[in-house]
Amino acid sequence: MKKAIIITSRVHPGEIPASFALEGMVDFLLSDAKEAKVLREQYIFYIVPMINIDGVVHGNQRTNLAGLDLNRVWSNPSYLLSPVVYAIKNLASMICKERKIDVFCDIHAHF
């Protein structure tokens, strides 16, 4: 059975280069490269390209619209104040019921 890899990005809205880094990763994973083919044979990839969409749209640098740094609420996310983190944790729990998660990668990048 294939294992899982979860990749997330843009938990901090101001980390624009993280989107480009993730785009490069996805381009590679979809390529004909031998290594990419091996990874696709061994893993299922779950990719969340932009965790903090509202923060990005509103020009925030680090927080969501509730003023929360989403990187600090993973242990106990609020359904109302940090719904995306809440949903990603639920997704990870559902994945764990079916397969092993080998990697959870949260991409950060600055200029």
Predicted regions and their residues:
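Active-site/substrate-binding loop(s) of hydrolase catalytic cores
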Residues: 1-111
